[in-house]
């Protein structure tokens, strides 16, 4: 421990707050909260805790701390700081940890939607749901049974669901409320009423010799019973709560969540994390702050935590966070723990192997480039069609893993003398001019898809901004396969195709290429539509964009029936559109 850190530790008060450990390069590597900052920070250096803590402690070179009024404020501040700085030794909720929900919107004409974001102000949510494929089948089944609005257009226009009696033209507001009530009962596992309705419809169809619909109603009954029963485990009571179980071994932590609704297990989710802090209470609390900040929360959360953290979480989310108190809750918590152990034993070998491969790749790259850290890598690729419709894509690797939430798309300017060189200058300038002006953290490394031309363009842009960020290019061979690292001095390092580093960089280059190409394809489709349908009288921007949502090509548009297109267009505009399409 250096003298500066020793002196700072002596001055820390016995008050609640957050502490930020920094390494020798002034990078924040871990953020924690404490009821007593002095006791908590000193505990890291009071003898060797274990391997996981020693790895963190060995990298500590400096400290910052922020004093707050109470533990609840510290909890909120810690969560915000972790989201801002993304420290390498903190538990970070993985990208894609927003679990799926089935949602009924609170619009005048409600729609049933399958979503991965939770916003209680937008409607009624059912979930979170496990096994996305099976639950999407449930979504489609519910949409076929109940007459929720299927369209985005005005309610007075007929749509393709009109003849199926699933159109807003044929549904009263009272019917929507009945449908919502039925869906609520289904997610409680109460199928008797809806099955009786479907059976009645089936019998009525048979009486009318309408065997096609009779078969449909019979299949709906079978599918509904199968999907619901396969996904729900019945308890012997009628409670709604979440159970949090966790298991720690060999510097890894498994956290498992059971979501019970009205006595039925609706979802089971599990995550595995490498950990570097000995205080499990703090790690679990940090995870729960992140998880419930972006997922639906139950009215009761049962988790084995100390009283201070339970109280802080309860105050933060205005719901009950409690230890298991009854025999029933203890039995379910034991079940969650058993599941966490089983998950650890069945998955940990694969998790460790993947993490070791990732660590090896990052260490090799750090060694080659002589860089201390690679927490954040930003990778760029430009794309265009004969220098028209130029775009750029940027993907972000956080601690070696792709974080899709941080990816960005750029529409680039076209000029008379535009080239790939100028496009790269533009996107690098726009990205880092913004980060600097907003005082945001710069990446540890920039990777550009390309050779010397692209590297020199990026270097020029950074020089104009007067900032210095390590930079490399990834060059491909004649077969369009990743081949070599291009350094800023023009030297190339040919990659061994059997190495872990090659696999890591090739995946990165493919990821950014696919991201950019996908964006270009969407833009190109829109451009073709725009040029071919230009000057169609009455087809304004709003109607044009609505058509793009449903038709991927001019051929799709040509084959659409008038009845379909009248959902989006007045009759006179449809006539004008048909005249234009017939000339193409």
Curated annotation (Swiss-Prot):
Organism of this sequence: Ureaplasma parvum serovar 3 (strain ATCC 27815 / 27 / NCTC 11736)
Function: The UvrABC repair system catalyzes the recognition and processing of DNA lesions. UvrC both incises the 5' and 3' sides of the lesion. The N-terminal half is responsible for the 3' incision and the C-terminal half is responsible for the 5' incision.
Subcellular location: Cytoplasm
GO BP annotation list: nucleotide-excision repair; SOS response
A Pfam family: UvrC_RNaseH_dom
UVR domain segment(s): 192-227
Ranges where the GIY-YIG domain occurs: 14-91
SMART domains (alphabetical): GIYc (SM00465)
InterPro entries associated with the record: ConA-like_dom_sf, GIY-YIG_endonuc, GIY-YIG_endonuc_sf, GIY-YIG_UvrC_Cho, RuvA_2-like, UvrABC_protein_C, UvrC, UvrC_RNase_H_dom
PANTHER family referenced in this protein's UniProt entry, alphabetically: UVRABC SYSTEM PROTEIN C, UVRC/OXIDOREDUCTASE
Name this polypeptide is given: UvrABC system protein C
Record note on quaternary structure: Interacts with UvrB in an incision complex.
One cellular component term from this protein's GO annotations in UniProt: cytoplasm
Major location (coarse): cytoplasm
GO molecular-function terms, A-Z: DNA binding; excinuclease ABC activity
Domain of life: Bacteria
Membership in a protein family: Belongs to the UvrC family.
Listed SUPFAM superfamilies: Concanavalin A-like lectins/glucanases (SSF49899), GIY-YIG endonuclease (SSF82771), RuvA domain 2-like (SSF47781)
Alphabetical UniProt keywords: Cytoplasm, DNA damage, DNA excision, DNA repair, Excision nuclease, SOS response
HAMAP family, per the entry: UvrC (MF_00203)
